[in-house]
Every structure is written in structure tokens, then in C-alpha cells.
Curated annotation (Swiss-Prot):
Induction: By androgens. Residues 1-21 form the signal peptide. Belongs to the beta-defensin family. Disulfide bonds join 33-60, 40-54, 44-61. GO terms for molecular function: lipopolysaccharide binding. It comes from Mus musculus. InterPro entries: DEFB136/42. PANTHER family: BETA-DEFENSIN 136, DEFENSIN BETA 136. This is Beta-defensin 42. Has bactericidal activity. May play a role in the antimicrobial protection of sperm and urogenital tract epithelia.
Amino acid sequence: MNLRLSCLLFILVTSLPAGRCSIGNKGISFETCTAIEGLCFFGCKLGWVWIAYCNNIMSCCRKDTDFVLPQTKGI
């Protein structure tokens, strides 16, 4: 029972719009975050800059244009 519950929890957590999600997504747009040209994630992606909180647990991130790392050019 505990193993099934753990697997279900793992699948639910990995399907959330996280910055390092295995499914790949473009984030969630909240009005407060899109007003400052950002997207909401559960942690910022590589090459994105943290701006503010979207709500209690999500972070508003914006793509970094000043210090672009070579690893992030393909993202």
C-alpha cells in the first residue's frame, strides 16, 4: 500500500509545472507575473531569473537576457 501511494505521489509531483519537469512545459501564466513578462514555475529553470512569488508556493521567473549561459541556449 505504501509503495503504491509513493508511486502515485511521485507521478503527481513530476507532472506539475516545475522548472525541471521531465514532461516539458512552458510554465503557468498568472496575471501578476505576466504583467512583468514572466511565467510561474515551482522553481526557476536554468537560464531564468527569479522575480517574485506568483502565489504561496510558485515562483515568477523571467528569461535571463543579460548573463546567458552557453548551456541554456538550447532551452
